[in-house]
Amino acid sequence: DSDITIDGRHKIYINKSNTSGNNYDIQVGTGANVNIQVDSGDVNLVTVQGKINVNSGGDYNVKVGGNYNMTVAGSRSVTVEGTTTDNTTGSVTHRGSRIDLNP
């Protein structure tokens, strides 16, 4: 076991020369986890150009302690290969120029 404690601002700049194909991988072996913890502050994932892709071999769980807001600049498509259940204790509002429930 080893712990490293550092103070101050630090930045890791990968592929500063902008060479195509210089990818950076973090791989963790079987039976271990990766945890990222911020005690007070934000976690920001940003791509200036490109996508953010998440692939899970099992369940994908999200727990939000406050509000959940999503803004989509293009279209939104959801495909479910099973059932969908939404449980809401408050009101539900759907707005659109046209809403087709059973097209």
Map each language-model feature to its residues.
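Right-handed beta-helix
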Residues: D1-P103
